[in-house]
């Protein structure tokens, strides 16, 4: 929040110019008056701040048996949220959800959707679960459906971006691993930038021979007795290919009490200086939402500035 004179000083603009700009923004609803500020002897100046409800962002998470959404304002406060269960996910179900929210919230600026599938530039290329979406360019489809920028990507990429933004902005590189109903997925940030590879296959650990061997060829969760070795071997692979500063393992019941064992196994597979810091995180949902919000907000602001 700031007064007209404070804004003028900060922007280096004349007081009349700032006054006209503020009047226009207040008329549009982007700025709101917050009363008078403190006085140093003269008349108290009116204070203005951004209206958090002027810009809304839709975050969509496509889960194994439901689609969950969270509509957030500029301050990341939840305006509306909910879940839609499904047996077989169809494009029509996603269309109906997005159209409904866009119709009811005309100040929706952008949307981001995460899905547990291999997604490359908006195209669902590999999925064992959402067969009706395979091969579709969801980004192009949704941008024709509603006149707002919308991106669709792999859930682990959004999760990793959120993890980086929330906790580890100073780390040079970061790798995340999450074990869900369809197995283990990974994500990678190098020098502050998400790295997905030439065609989006980076961190698709399910294609690794060690994963298939220790998972007994299953598409679901690995056997409990192989959990520690599987995680340690994955960390070993990342260490010799990327050499990250930090590995973040997201909490799962099968991981409980195994972190020390994973570290011991890593010490037997790698020299000490190659072992990254290994952290267990309980913040899956917070990090996932943070990643979705960060991307959606960035797209919305780019449109406002004429960049998209």
PLM region spans:
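ATP-binding/phosphotransfer module of carbohydrate and carboxylate kinases, centering on a glycine-rich
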Residues: 1-34, 40-43, 47-83, 89-100, ...
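Short clusters of small/polar residues that mark proteolytic maturation junctions
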Residues: 7, 83, 129, 199-200
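Short glycine-aspartate micro-motif
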Residues: 57-61, 110-112, 174-178, 185
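Short, ordered coil/turn segments that flank beta-strands lining enzyme active or ligand-binding pockets
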Residues: 74-75, 120, 190-191
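Hydrophobic "anchor" residues
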Residues: 78, 124, 194-195
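Glycine-rich phosphate-binding loop and adjoining helix at the ATP-binding site
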Residues: 81-83, 87-166, 171, 259-269
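Short glycine-rich anion-binding loops that position phosphate/pyrophosphate groups of nucleotides
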Residues: 116-118, 182-183, 253-254
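Glycine/GP-enriched mid-protein hinge/lid loop-to-helix segment characteristic of carbohydrate kinases
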Residues: 149-240
């Amino acid at each position: 929040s700031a007064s007209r004179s404070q804004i003028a000083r900060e922007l280096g603009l004349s007081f009349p110019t700032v006054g006209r700009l503020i009047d226009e923004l207040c008329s549009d609803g982007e700025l709101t008056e917050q009363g008078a500020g403190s006085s140093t002897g003269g008349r108290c100046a009116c204070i203005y701040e951004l209206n958090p409800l002027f810009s809304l962002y839709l975050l969509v998470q496509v889960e194994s048996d439901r689609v969950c959404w969270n509509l957030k304002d500029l301050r990341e406060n939840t305006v509306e949220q909910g879940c839609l269960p499904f047996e077989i996910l169809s494009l029509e179900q996603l269309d109906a959800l997005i159209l409904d929210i866009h119709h009811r919230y005309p100040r929706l600026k952008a949307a981001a959707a995460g899905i547990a599938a291999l997604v490359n530039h908006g195209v669902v290329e590999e999925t064992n679960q959402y067969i009706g979406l395979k091969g579709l360019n969801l980004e192009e489809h949704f941008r024709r459906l509603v006149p707002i920028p919308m991106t669709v990507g792999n859930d682990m990429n959004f999760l990793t971006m959120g993890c980086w933004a929330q906790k580890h902005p100073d780390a040079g590189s970061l790798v995340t691993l999450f074990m869900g109903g369809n197995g283990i997925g990974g994500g990678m940030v190098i020098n502050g930038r998400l790295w997905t590879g030439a065609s989006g296959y980076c961190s698709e650990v399910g294609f690794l021979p060690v994963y298939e061997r220790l998972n007994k060829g299953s598409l679901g969760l690995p056997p409990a007795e192989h959990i520690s070795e599987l995680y340690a071997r994955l960390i070993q692979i990342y260490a010799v290919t990327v050499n990250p500063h930090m590995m973040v393992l997201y909490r799962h019941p099968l991981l409980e009490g195994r972190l020390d064992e994973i570290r011991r196994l890593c010490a037997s597979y790698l020299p000490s200086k190659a072992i990254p810091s290994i952290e267990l995180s309980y913040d899956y949902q917070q990090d996932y939402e943070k990643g979705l919000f960060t991307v959606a907000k960035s797209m919305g602001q780019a449109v406002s500035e004429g960049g998209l």
